[in-house]
Amino acid sequence: MPAENIVEVHHLKKSVGQGEHELSILTGVELVVKRGETIALVGESGSGKSTLLAILAGLDDGSSGEVSLVGQPLHNMDEEARAKLRAKHVGFVFQSFMLIPTLNALENVELPALLRGESSAESRNGAKALLEQLGLGKRLDHLPAQLSGGEQQRVALARAFNGRPDVLFADEPTGNLDRQTGDKIADLLFSLNREHGTTLIMVTHDLQLAARCDRCLRLVNGQLQEEA
């Protein structure tokens, strides 16, 4: 039976530096996210939102505390086990888009579906449809270096969508995009949630996007507070 709680966090702390130079970023985060929820993480720039998102996705570690992802405690896992867990269950879009530089846009987007076991034709058709939806139908054969920053962002989002993950972590998914494109991205995010039950956890400064989520959590002084 799939875990009811996609993410579970207790007493999470994160500090950098040592001694008098030590800086506390997270000071005791508590969080439970149920399967299928949509969560917005908001807060001032530099408050630690991106750091928290990376820890939740198993890409970074806290200094202390417990984090579980799809029912699996991350502190018990080595990086190989975490990578397998992410490949099976997790999609993510961070501000560094992590596109494979030697693959073109279409190949980058179809990769998650191939890893999931879809046929080459299925994965390619799905990837092409997503890229066309995002206005990149004429950029299918372009390498990441040949795309603008906004275009790379859309490719990264399409790749995450094409994996149909159990949970999608997104850092400013509509940042640096015009309102029309941002609204299209938001609609795709919530269709992924609605049609596939994907849990969404996103850092955003976009108040319209945050308002569409089930819960909006503000990171203040290293701890989460629920917004009204």
From Swiss-Prot:
Name of protein: Uncharacterized ABC transporter ATP-binding protein YbbA
Write down the InterPro entries for this protein, in alphabetical order.
AAA+_ATPase, ABC_transporter-like_ATP-bd, ABC_transporter-like_CS, MacB-like_ATP-bd, P-loop_NTPase
Tell me the domain of life: Bacteria
Q: Domain ABC transporter: where? A: 7-228
List, alphabetically, the PROSITE patterns matched: ABC_TRANSPORTER_1, ABC_TRANSPORTER_2
Residues bound to ATP are 43-50
| SUPFAM superfamilies in the cross-refs | P-loop containing nucleoside triphosphate hydrolases
Q: Which gene encodes it?
A: ybbA
Q: Name one GO molecular function term.
A: ATP hydrolysis activity
Source organism of the structure: Escherichia coli (strain K12)
Cited PANTHER family? ABC TRANSPORTER ATP-BINDING PROTEIN MG467-RELATED (PTHR42798:SF2), LIPOPROTEIN-RELEASING SYSTEM ATP-BINDING PROTEIN LOLD (PTHR42798)
